[in-house]
């Protein structure tokens, strides 16, 4: 095991321990590590759905989660900000050629260029 990630079982507790308050999140203050909070939220949702947590790295590329769903291995990229482009997801797709990829963000449902877009509020749909 070369590296690992740790997640807290409760995003509220994580926010409190990190000293983040709701005002900072609502205002979109850049000093708040919103990406880590969002990724942690998705991790807890995946665990609740029974998925073991795996991720993928290669060089400077990292895909947040890799799950097995209906005998398919699917990469999941989590985006907390408006920019949903992911070079790492593209690297993974070029290397492994999954049937499709999943992007979880604040954007609506959609499917474009082999990427299934799922809004954060609907992670339970996985």
Locate the predicted segments by residue.
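Catalytic cores of nucleic-acid endonucleases
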Residues: 80-120
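A broadly conserved detector of short glycine/acidic/proline-rich loop/turn motifs that flank catalytic sites
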Residues: 12-13, 59, 71, 80, ...
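Short hydrophobic-aromatic micro-motifs
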Residues: 6-9, 76, 117
């Amino acid at each position: 095991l070369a590296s690992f990630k740790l997640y807290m079982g409760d995003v509220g507790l994580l926010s409190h321990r990190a000293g983040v308050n709701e005002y900072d999140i609502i205002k979109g203050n850049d000093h708040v590590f919103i990406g880590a909070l969002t990724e942690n939220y998705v991790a807890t949702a995946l665990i609740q759905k029974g998925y073991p947590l795996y991720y993928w790295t290669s060089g400077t590329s990292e895909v947040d989660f890799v799950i097995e769903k209906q005998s398919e291995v699917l990469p999941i990229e989590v985006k907390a900000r408006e920019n949903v482009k992911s070079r790492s997801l593209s690297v993974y797709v070029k290397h492994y050629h999954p049937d499709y990829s999943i992007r979880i963000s604040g954007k609506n449902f959609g499917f474009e260029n082999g990427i299934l877009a799922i809004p954060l509020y609907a992670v339970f749909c996985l």
